[in-house]
Structure formats: structure tokens, C-alpha cells
């Protein structure tokens, strides 16, 4: 399954997008400076329920400023070992403290990495406000990372998905 909503987290605010056949439709945005952030997010959540009564399940879009993007020349058969070697030492965090995705395109290895703690904070925020987060992604400029980096499932995803469902990534 692909999540029917995306919660776009930025340093200025939160946007909720609904998946439509042609891509994504903006449901609404809330400023982080909103007088009553919780109430404003509640309105977004209720609007989502009216738009799509099948249930709200979101992918969390992590701000690009929280992601380390690396591009390195590589051989055509690069794999996990090359990704970890390229990441090692580029952040103050241990490799096991990072979630990352990578793609190989034309001999160039594109890597996107984010601190797991950041993902946990985003998940907790979305859970507190009832947005049912199932996965983590980013939406960088295509020169940084071709496609949509996928940082995996949320810790709560198994509770939000049907037993037979898996989350499919957008490419």
C-alpha cells in the first residue's frame, strides 16, 4: 500500500497532502506560529477524514535541512558496504544512529542519511496529533537524490497496517 496522505514537516510549518491520481493535492498548511497549533492540526486531520473516509495513514516528509546528502563516483555494482564507507565520518553520528537510502545512477552513488532520533521526534509529533504515520521520506532536489529517499517504516506502522499490508515506496 502507498500512504494516502503525506505530512510535510518544515521549519516554518506543517502541510498535509492527499494522494490523487495525478500526484498530490494540498489539503492545508499550519504555521508553527499558529496561536493554537493543536487545534489547527485537528482541523487538518478532520478535513482529511472528510476527503478520504478510508482512513488517514501518512508518510512523514522530513525537512531536507535535516538530511545529509552525499554524491560520490562509484562502480556500477556498488552496494551497502560502499554506502557505509561513503557515510562513515561525514556526520558526528555513528552509522547505526543513521537511517539512509541510496541509489546508483550512471556510476554515481547518491546517498541520503538522517539521524534516527530525528525520525523518532517526527513520528512522536505525528502520533500525538493523530496523523497515523507509517513511513519516512524526503523530497530533495533531483540533483541531490534522484527520486524519493525512503527511510523506512515508523515504529508504529505494524499497528496501523493490516496484517498483510506492506508500505510501497514512491519512486
What residue spans do the PLM features occupy?
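Hydrophobic/aromatic-enriched cytosolic interaction surfaces used to assemble or bind macromolecules
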Residues: 1-171
